[in-house]
């Protein structure tokens, strides 16, 4: 089990930012850390990886990553990392990149087969697409058979179609090797598909945690559904107002009375829900 209870304070001339978290992740769980930019997600991951220090305690199974007296170096934590930047060796082919991590040709071939990369194993990195490079990065991260895998928004630079395929590959890896996985993401659909545990960070603090259903499905009472959206534009039309909404990659609109419209402005994050036969907007 992964246990974290720590805080880190950042100071500059303008303001102070404190990251303070306490949570646990069971062995084999896929946990997503979700939140807006600047909420502390990547800093949390860097502390967990050993790239930054914090005050408190972090343990994984029987190993102390850090506490008041101990600090285990990143190399000794036996973690796997995958970042948005592939960080692959461009002068090596795919197979060589994996074997650089660990000289285990049998396991390298197993991973290449699992990630549908066998036909590219002699290809150089510059010959690969973005999605293929990220699969190589994932395979290389697994080569040393880590018990804990850290993913820092690894798919954010890829288009949606490629991203969806990579989600399937990642789930297959997770299911096959049962690696405890921590994913940093700000993509609701990605988190919902991949994770069985979600932690939401806001301004350096955990504001909610639970299963994806508990965190993201916010229907209550007689509500039929509730969808997170953002108001792109609020415009007056005759005696009503029209709210133009961004819902994922789709655009929709909802009619509001003048009384309802006064509670909203452009760029507000809202929940679009249905109650009885009416559509409702609620500010988050």
How does the language model describe each region?
Residues 63-66, 105-120, 172:
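Conserved ABC ATPase "signature" region
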Residues 64-81:
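ABC ATPase NBD coupling module
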Residues 124-128, 132-134:
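Conserved ABC ATPase signature
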Residues 138:
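Hydrophobic anchor residue at the start of the ABC signature
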Residues 143-147:
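A short, proline-enriched helix->beta-strand linker immediately N-terminal to the Walker B motif
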Residues 149-153:
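Catalytic Walker B motif of ABC-type/P-loop ATPase nucleotide-binding domains
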């Amino acid at each position: 089990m992964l246990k974290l209870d720590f805080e880190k304070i950042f100071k500059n001339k303008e303001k102070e930012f404190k990251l303070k978290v306490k949570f646990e992740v069971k062995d084999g769980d896929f946990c997503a850390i979700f939140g807006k930019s600047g909420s502390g997600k990547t800093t949390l991951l860097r502390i967990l990886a050993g790239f930054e220090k914090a005050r408190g305690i972090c343990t994984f199974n029987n190993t102390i990553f850090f506490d008041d007296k101990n600090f285990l170096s990143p190399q000794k934590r036996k973690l796997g990392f995958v970042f948005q930047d592939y960080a692959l060796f461009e002068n090596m082919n795919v197979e060589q990149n994996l074997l650089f991590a660990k000289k285990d040709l049998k396991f390298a071939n197993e991973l290449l087969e699992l990630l549908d990369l066998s036909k590219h194993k002699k290809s150089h990195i510059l010959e690969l697409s973005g999605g293929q490079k990220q699969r190589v990065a994932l395979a290389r991260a697994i080569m040393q058979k880590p018990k804990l895998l850290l993913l820092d928004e690894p798919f954010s630079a890829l288009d949606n179609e490629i991203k969806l395929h990579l989600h399937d590959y990642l789930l297959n890896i997770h299911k096959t090797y049962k690696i405890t996985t921590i994913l940093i993401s700000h993509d609701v659909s990605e988190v919902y598909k991949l994770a069985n545990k979600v932690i939401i960070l806001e301004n350096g603090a955990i504001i909610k945690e639970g299963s994806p259903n508990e965190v993201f499905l916010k229907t209550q009472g007689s509500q039929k559904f509730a969808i997170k959206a953002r108001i792109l534009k609020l415009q007056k039309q005759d005696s009503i107002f029209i709210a133009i909404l961004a819902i994922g990659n789709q655009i929709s609109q909802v009619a509001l009375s003048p009384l309802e419209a006064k509670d909203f402005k452009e760029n507000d994050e809202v929940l679009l829900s249905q109650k009885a036969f009416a559509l409702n907007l609620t500010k988050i």
